[in-house]
A protein has these predicted regions:
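N-terminal export signals
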Residues: 5-21
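A domain-start/cap signature at the N-terminus of enzymes
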Residues: 16-46, 316, 320, 326
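Serine-hydrolase catalytic machinery in alpha/beta-hydrolase-like enzymes
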Residues: 35-141
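Glycine-rich His-Gly loop
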Residues: 58-62, 151-152, 186, 212
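Short beta-to-alpha linker loops that shape the active-site pocket of alpha/beta-hydrolase fold enzymes
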Residues: 87-91, 187, 252
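Primarily recognizes the serine-hydrolase "nucleophile elbow" in alpha/beta-hydrolase
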Residues: 125-202
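The feature captures the conserved acid-bearing segment of alpha/beta-hydrolase catalytic domains
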Residues: 172-251
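Alpha/beta-hydrolase-fold serine-hydrolase catalytic core, especially in secreted/extracellular enzymes
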Residues: 250-255, 260-326
């Protein structure tokens, strides 16, 4: 197994109110799924101490990498979770380097979503196997406290394993071992072939959708339909009442929710270029997202009553921000 240790930027450490996410020491590894002859670059963060911990598996967006979600990966680690950032070959930064915009458009084909879902299942299989074998730190992992998150195409991946329905049946997508989900920049079906309730009504576990007023469509209307902030927010309306939430951030764009991910693409690809005022607000947005998502995981994976109480009316929201939950 290939491994190199990284030292992240130093900042305020925790997930509690007022904290700023930081990138903590992490290990970059390569995990190979022999059954598919597929090697996944991984970034792995362990929480300090010896206590039992939950696990969160994060999926990057199109053209991203295991660096996706770094902005909150450290905060989730500080909240008591093992955090695993998965890189998906075929829809990652290497695909963009090899083929540019055309390769990323091709990466939205169904076979890449199938591969991504299988990647997530393989990672959870590995978590389970290592935990049951009680291999070193893996003996700490609570198999009843696994969550999944993703940004953009990673959110599409998370929607699939959470139970989203498709016009064509997609057997084997649902991952029952995940107990809660966070989708950054989620999206409904572009063609609207199913109603929102038909698409998302079967998701029966806690699901947090996160978007913002500038969260547009980097692919600019692939398939003839352009996704906008309101369509991303509409995912909430399709989810069953009782275990759903929506965080809307005023002035946050699509790249805000990548969590420092696709910076290298942003410098080369027009749709990712940002207004200076959006970038200036990003640190505050990242801090708020890190805190609220940390509380979400603690409430729904660890049964933390204080975190659940904080989510009833999260502090720190601006006048243009919105929080909905029921």
């Amino acid at each position: 197994m290939q491994r190199r240790h990284l030292l992240g930027a130093v900042g305020a450490a925790a997930w509690w109110p007022g904290a700023i996410a930081r990138v903590l020491p992490a290990a970059d590894e390569s995990w190979t799924d022999a059954a598919r002859d597929r090697t996944l670059p991984m970034r792995v963060r362990w929480p300090d101490g010896e206590d039992a911990c939950g696990a969160i598996v994060h999926s990057h967006g199109l053209g991203g990498s295991r660096e996706g979600g770094d902005a909150w990966g450290g905060a989730w680690r500080d909240a008591g979770f093992l955090v695993l950032h998965v890189q998906h070959p075929g829809s990652d930064i290497q695909a963009f380097r090899d083929g540019g915009m055309g390769a990323l458009r091709e990466a939205t084909r169904p076979e890449q979503l199938v591969a991504r879902v299988a990647d997530m299942r393989f990672v959870i299989d590995e978590i389970e196997r290592r935990a049951r074998e009680r291999r070193g730190l893996w003996s700490r992992v609570r198999l009843d406290a696994i969550g999944a998150s993703g940004h953009s195409y990673g959110a599409v991946t998370v929607q699939a394993i959470a139970g989203k329905r498709y016009p064509v049946p997609a057997p084997g997508f649902v991952e029952p071992r995940c107990r809660a989900f966070v989708a950054f920049s989620p999206s409904p079906d572009r063609q609207g072939r199913l109603s929102l309730a038909q698409q998302f009504g079967a998701i029966d576990r806690p699901f947090l959708a996160i978007t913002g007023s500038l969260d547009g469509d980097p692919l600019r209307g692939r398939g003839g339909v352009e996704l906008g902030p309101e369509s991303r927010a509409s995912v909430y309306d399709g989810l069953p009442a009782g275990q759903r939430a929506l965080l809307w951030l005023d002035g946050a764009d699509h790249m805000t929710f990548g969590g420092n991910a696709e910076r290298r693409i942003a410098a080369r690809w027009g749709p990712f270029k940002r207004a200076p005022e959006v970038a200036a607000r990003e640190p505050g947005h990242h801090a708020l997202v890190a805190r609220i998502t940390g509380q979400w995981w603690r409430a729904h994976l660890l049964g933390d009553a204080a975190a659940a109480a904080a989510l009833r009316s999260p502090p720190g929201l601006g006048s243009g921000d919105r929080w909905r939950s029921d």
